């Protein structure tokens, strides 16, 4: 079966979001690693833990993309939607708690959030529901 337009758009938006997050992570890596909370985590779990967590997170995002867009997994579709909602809540919470943030990382986070929003919307359009074998 040819992938529907919504699934192709999902791939563009979702992978774009992952790319923006990768750039944002690379740009803020040094600052994040010297953060007092990160230093405490490194002391408790080891200096390798932030890097391992980052690799795990990006791997999970790419696996979910593969299973949703290529393997037609309805579970992956819902996992992406649930993680999106949790990420949105975390983003809003971080804005209210952490105070002023640098403009470029904040801007990249907003762009990533917009791309992820568009990707999740694409997963629940009528042609995408048919792709996953769900009723529209």
What kind of feature is each model-predicted range?
Residues 1-136:
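Topology signature of small-to-medium multi-pass alpha-helical membrane proteins
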């Amino acid at each position: 079966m040819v992938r529907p337009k919504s699934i192709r758009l999902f791939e563009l938006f979702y992978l774009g979001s992952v790319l923006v997050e990768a750039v944002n992570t690379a740009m803020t890596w040094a600052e994040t690693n010297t953060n007092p909370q990160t230093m405490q985590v490194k002391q408790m779990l080891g200096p390798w833990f932030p890097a391992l967590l980052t690799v795990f997170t990006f791997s999970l995002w790419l696996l979910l993309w593969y299973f949703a867009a290529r393997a037609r997994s309805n579970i992956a579709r819902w996992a992406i939607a649930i993680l999106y909602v949790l990420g949105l809540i975390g983003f809003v919470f971080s804005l209210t708690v952490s105070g002023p943030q640098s403009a470029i990382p904040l801007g990249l986070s907003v762009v990533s959030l917009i791309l992820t929003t568009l990707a999740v919307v694409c997963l629940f359009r009528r042609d995408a529901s048919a792709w996953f074998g769900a009723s529209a």
